[in-house]
Regions:
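Small-molecule kinase domains that catalyze NTP-dependent phosphoryl transfer to phosphate-bearing small molecules
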Residues: 246-306
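Positively charged
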Residues: 1-31
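Conserved lysine of the Walker
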Residues: 128
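Conserved substrate/cofactor phosphate-moiety recognition/catalytic segment
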Residues: 136-200
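Active-site activation/catalytic loop segments of kinase-like enzymes and analogous catalytic loops
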Residues: 33-64, 79-93
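ATP/Mg2+ or Mg2+-diphosphate-binding catalytic cores
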Residues: 86-124
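Conserved phosphate-donor/acceptor-positioning beta-strand/loop module used by diverse small-molecule
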Residues: 224-244
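Hydrophobic positions on the alpha1 helix immediately C-terminal to the Walker A/P-loop
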Residues: 131
Length: 306
């Protein structure tokens, strides 16, 4: 099997150079893409940026839908860390770089804390996605493998369109009909199940306005043997309306919801029941990001018992 070849390079010096051409070898040219993603993840993790590391993984999953690949993420990242540690000893990185990557390797090989499932609830404009992102980052800072799964992204994936694609008036009824919504929550269940099986906590970013949708996720958590947490987002109606108008103006977000959608949701949503309230966390999102982050940290400490 030829892994290295001598290539003639047409430059003024008329020299030949030896270059690896592994990528042209049929047996070696292909790699599990989660292995490549694990390289970036590992480097962020090794440089003490766990929140950025898991934010990157969530973005990768939003783009690929490869939640099953999470099973290989930590082993692949550990392998990458081992290679970096070896290279550090052989090169100029020295003891400091070796120590960084060796500690990273040890952390990746250690059994992770027990995962959990966090489900967002709230009408459009209440700040669910912002809270979900803050929660994911906070869980990562607490040393927990974690990914966020967004209903807006998974709905568009099922429809075979880009995350930021917008429906025409004729398409809206199909995209947001009862059948498509059921399929979307089924897809969220599948993605969350894959993440939990890989030892990752999951933050499910969805409206969850019907009790059946919330019970679906609670049942999944029970079947997986993990704790279920319901986080309910609130905001003043006028502020929610302003946010949605601004989001529509800026574009680029997977959510299609506008002010009219929010008003309809307020009319038909199924409030949290007395049974659900026992384990639910209520968040007030008044528009102050720092205050919201403080709330998230405080509620997460309650959930984790720290």
């Amino acid at each position: 099997m030829a892994i290295r070849e001598i290539l003639e390079v047409p430059d003024p010096r008329l020299k030949t150079v030896s270059t690896p051409v592994t990528e042209f070898d049929e047996d070696l040219r292909r790699i599990d893409v989660i292995n490549d993603a694990a390289f970036t993840f590992m480097d962020l993790f090794a440089h003490d940026e766990p929140a950025l590391a898991w934010r990157f993984v969530s973005a990768y999953l939003d783009g690929t839908g490869d939640h099953d690949g999470l099973r290989g993420l930590r082993p692949y990242a550990a392998y990458r860390a081992l290679v970096r540690a070896h290279v550090a000893l052989l090169g100029s990185g020295g003891v400091e770089a070796f120590g960084r990557y060796w500690r990273c390797l040890e952390a990746l090989m250690a059994p992770p804390p027990a995962p959990g499932l966090w489900l967002m609830m709230g009408v459009s404009g209440s700040g669910k996605s912002t809270v979900a992102g803050l929660l994911r980052d906070a869980l990562a800072e607490h040393g927990r493998p974690v990914v966020r799964v967004r209903s807006d992204v998974e709905r568009k994936r099922l429809l075979g369109v880009a995350p930021t694609a917008r429906p025409t008036l004729a398409q809206t009824a199909h995209w947001y009909g009862a059948d498509q919504t059921r399929q979307t929550y089924d897809r969220l269940m599948t993605a969350a199940q894959s993440a939990l099986a890989a030892g990752c906590s999951v933050v499910v970013d969805a409206a969850s306005l019907r009790r059946t949708e919330r019970e679906q996720m609670r049942t999944l958590a029970a079947m997986a043997g993990v704790r279920f947490h319901l986080w309910v987002c609130h905001a003043p109606q006028a502020l929610m309306a302003d946010r949605l108008v601004e989001r529509e103006r800026q574009g680029g977000d997977p959510s299609d919801a506008g002010r009219a959608v929010m008003e309809r949701q307020l009319a038909w949503m199924e409030p949290v029941t007395a049974d659900e309230k026992a384990g639910a966390r209520e968040l007030s999102n008044e528009g102050d990001l720092a205050a919201l982050a403080t709330q998230v940290q405080a509620l997460l400490r309650q959930d984790l018992g720290t």
